[in-house]
Amino acid sequence: MKMKLFIAIFAFAIVASCNNKKKHPTTDIDVARAFIKDILENNYKEAQTFVLNEDMNNQYFDLSKKEFESKSKEELKLYKDADIIVNEIKSLNDSVTVVNFSNTYKRNIKNEVKVVKVNGEWFVDLKHTFQQVLNVK
């Protein structure tokens, strides 16, 4: 009897843990928000799942990861505790959206992230973000 109970509990635990997988957001805004939050929380492994898998995007992602990780622990904590402020959402067409955002830690710094729909899924296209940064400098 104890063995059957143990097996039942063990099987339930396995099924429950399999259902805890994080699902890829299905809307442009949700992908942008999840990506930004993962970056703020220094969760690059999860953030990279939202990036459009292209060489240039991967290079930009690695560059921003190195820059962000070079910050002090205190500053990383401030970013982690920050909330996202969505300043503007521009739907350019049915497969491209640009989200202008800042965060509660650095309200005065506004950034943009472009999300594109590829094969029915939304992804972050960092080429737009880095082009914006280069145009400012």
Indicate where each model-derived feature is located.
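Sec-dependent signal peptide recognition
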Residues: K2-I9
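Bacterial signal peptide processing site
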Residues: N19-K21
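Residue-level detector of alpha-helical recognition elements and their boundaries
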Residues: A11, F50, D62-L63, F130, ...
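C-terminal motif of bacterial Sec signal peptides marking the signal peptidase cleavage site
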Residues: I14-S17
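Exposed beta-sheet edge and beta->alpha loop/turn motif
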Residues: L76-L78, D83-K137
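Short solvent-exposed beta->alpha transition segments
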Residues: H24, I29-D30, A34, Y44-L92
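A generic structural signal for short
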Residues: K23-H24, F101
